[in-house]
Amino acid sequence: NSEDLDFISSVSKETLSFDLLDVIQSGPDDRLNQTSFTQPALLATSYLYYKKFLSITELTPNIMAGHSLGEYSALVASGSIDFKTALNLVYKRGLFMEKSDAGSMFAILNLNIETIYSICDEVRDTLDEIVAPANINSANQVVIAGSHKAAALASEKCKVAGANATGILKFG
């Protein structure tokens, strides 16, 4: 609803010194794709979905859980931290990611973890650059991360081995 959108807009202006809602709606895309903007945008979207859920159901969740960035959404939904605090934290999280060494992340789908580790080891030894599984999201989805070159090569080798691989993020 418009009250929730106004809330996102005003809190982001106050906390981050820019209107997050405007960035989400108007871009430009290259700005929205920077992790310092992407992370707050995802938090805001999750928050809005949660508020919508509460408005259309009579359910009151007893337990909240989140994974990675979703942990912040869960903390807000549970009342453990307020939206303003979470927004500031995820913005800083995105800034730190942008300042880290340059690299890429790829989601590797439908390939067993042993094969992924083996491919990452092989690429690391061949190129003498870092690439490794960074996040095991499920039995069917593992995120690998490393230098642009090593992560891209490992992703391609995973595809040859039968995986579906999707580039998800460049950082640094």
Which residue stretches match the model-derived regions?
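Helix-rich "cap/lid" substructures immediately adjacent to catalytic or cofactor-binding pockets
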Residues: 1-65, 111, 144
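An amphipathic alpha-helix/helix-turn recognition signal
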Residues: 7, 41, 68-69, 81, ...
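Alpha/beta catalytic cores of group-transfer enzymes, especially the acyltransferase/condensing modules
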Residues: 13-18, 27, 51, 78-172
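Gly/Ala-rich beta-loop-alpha elbow adjacent to hydrolase catalytic centers
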Residues: 46, 62-70, 74, 82
